Amino acid sequence: MSIPLRLLILWLFCCMHAHAVAADFSATIASVKKSVVGIGSHKQTRSPAVVFSGTGFIVGDGRSVITNAHVVTASMKGDPLETVGIVIGRGEGFEFRPARVVSVDAEHDLAHLVIEGAALPALQLGDGALMAEGKELGFTGFPLGMVLGLHPVTHRALLSAITPIVMPSLSSGKLGAGAIMQLQRARFPVYQLDATAYPGNSGSPVYDPQTGIVYGVINMVFVKGLKESAITSPSGITYAVPIVHARDILQRKSGAAK
């Protein structure tokens, strides 16, 4: 077989493989979107009645929801007439379903909610082992909230680094109060992604494009604020909390906090 023919066959094989990978990702997105929900609150006397605060995703038995703790806190204002819950549906045709906050992990900025009513399609969680740098990933959420209707948006991402949530600074004056508090706790690794996300993406699942298995939770407020406290202009870097911490919070009893 001549060298040009071999190169042609190799090129065709690469093209076919790339097409198959793209097709797999499209199928994964369609499946994952069924499990991605908005997080917010409902108050009948307010206009609009439903206020969006972030993204979450369904796990376990189809009634458990994982999101960021700060997303839930934003929805809990102590008003007895206000109810925390999830928002499902597409476009303008969305539905609000009440939820109960089961447990909150302030250290890793995660929360576990349980919804009322029928179960929804659930995502599978990874085994908790840290991923290898260089892995291609995807994440789906609501970067713009409900401003233009409830439309989930998917982004590709590259796991560019695994770093401590807070790095000791050469100058203590560059560390904010939150960073100093975190240094006093046990530091844990977070995923640094080569992708752009927005505050509405907080709580979005980070998953394998081929399998849909979730390996992390996007965090655009808590982690980003700690990691970039010494930077005058925040970067476009996206961070995610490893899924092992979501696995831990799912095992806690109702009302437990950390």
What is each PLM-predicted segment?
Residues 82-85, 90-99, 133-138, 152-176:
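Beta-strand/loop subdomains of soluble extracytoplasmic proteins
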Residues 27-28, 75, 100-102, 116-151:
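Active-site substrate-binding loop(s) of clan PA
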Residues 60-106:
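Catalytic-histidine neighborhood of serine endopeptidases
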Residues 23-25, 42-68, 96-98, 203, ...:
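A conserved glycine-rich beta-strand in the N-terminal activation segment of trypsin-fold
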Residues 59-60, 78, 131, 209:
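Short, well-ordered loop/turn sites that connect or cap secondary structure elements
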Residues 61, 104-108, 162-168:
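Short, conserved beta-turn/loop elements at beta-strand boundaries and strand-helix junctions
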Residues 31-49, 114-124, 153-251:
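Active-site region of chymotrypsin-like
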Residues 7-17:
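Bacterial N-terminal signal peptides
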